From Swiss-Prot:
Phenotype of gene-disrupted mutants: Attempts to generate homozygous knockout mosquitoes were unsuccessful, since gene disruption interferes with both male and female mosquito reproductive biology. Partial knockdown results in severe defects in reproductive system development. Underdeveloped ovaries. No yolk accumulation and oocyte development after blood feeding. Developmental defects in testis. No significant effects on male accessory gland development. Altered expression of genes involved in oogenesis, 20-hydroxyecdysone synthesis and immune responses. Reduced expression of ZPG gene, a regulator of germ cell development.
Topology versus the membrane: Single-pass membrane protein
Leader sequence segment: 1-18
Organism of provenance: Anopheles gambiae (African malaria mosquito)
GO molecular function: oxidoreductase activity; oxidoreductase activity, acting on a sulfur group of donors, disulfide as acceptor
Induction, per UniProt: Up-regulated in midgut in response to a blood meal.
Places the protein is found: Membrane
Name recorded for this polypeptide: Gamma-interferon-inducible lysosomal thiol reductase-like protein
Cited InterPro entries: Interferon-induced_GILT (IPR004911)
């Protein structure tokens, strides 16, 4: 009975220490090479691995700007008109992607990140039209037509304007793209760390930290506490065997 209790305590300790979640806002542009590199090589793999510890908010606007004339919204984008359209596709995807019965174990958030990752990769190849449908086919989402209709309508403009307002609330204009803000607060040192090693930046902001952060240097007292708990429980269990 004591053995089972100690084993459950060990599992409980590890589980509890892996449940912290931090809001992360990523401000990016649909045709920005630096944004694509960051999302494809850093954000995507880390967010997939640590999704239980990450509340991800994607904000596709970057250094764009907008003006309004009545109900019309006109955008000027860092990489030209095509990027304005691409930003609208991203904004519409974030709004319209839903989970589906064909992928019951994949959430709306998972599908959205998969789709955005594909869009950023494919758009950099510059091999034709913006990859709205191609990525929808690859990721297996059903809402590509709704995304297309949205991007080509006032809905897309309004959604992109909302992302612009979120961006301008952080910085107007952004100092650099992509920008990563934890808890929607800009920190210059965290920004530098995020773009060089997003995993380190995320783990630094998790308290207590999950086991996925154990292999990183300077993991802090939270990891030491977790290691101590698990070690003590392991020793107690070994003495009972």
């Amino acid at each position: 009975m004591l053995f089972k209790s100690l084993l459950l305590l060990s599992v409980y300790a590890v589980t509890c220490y892996g449940q912290s979640k931090v809001p992360v806002y990523v401000y990016y542009e649909s045709l920005c090479p630096d944004s694509a590199r960051f999302i494809n090589e850093q954000l995507y793999p880390v967010a997939k691995e640590l999704k239980k510890n990450l509340e991800l908010h994607l904000v596709p606007f970057g250094k764009s700007s907008y003006t309004t004339q009545g109900s019309d919204v006109m955008f000027t984008c860092h990489h030209g008109e095509n990027e304005c359209y691409g930003n609208k596709v991203h904004a519409c995807a974030i709004q319209h992607i839903q989970g589906n019965s064909y992928q019951p174990n994949i959430s709306k958030e998972d599908l959205t990140l998969d789709y955005v990752n594909c869009l950023m990769h494919r758009a950099q190849l510059k091999d034709g039209a913006f990859p709205t449908k191609r990525c929808a086919d690859e990721v297996k989402i059903d809402q590509w037509q709704a995304i297309m209709d949205c991007a080509n309508s006032t809905e897309g403009s309004q959604l992109l304007k909302q992302h612009g307002d979120v961006t301008n609330k952080l910085q107007s204009p952004l100092k650099s793209v992509p920008t990563v803000a934890f808890k929607q607060t800009y920190d210059d040192e965290l920004q530098k760390l995020s773009v060089s090693s997003f995993r380190h930046a995320l783990c630094k902001n998790l308290s207590p930290q999950p086991v996925e952060c154990l292999d990183l240097p300077s993991t802090g007292s939270a990891i030491s506490s977790l290691g101590m708990i698990v070690t003590v429980v392991a020793v107690l269990i070994s003495r009972l065997l």
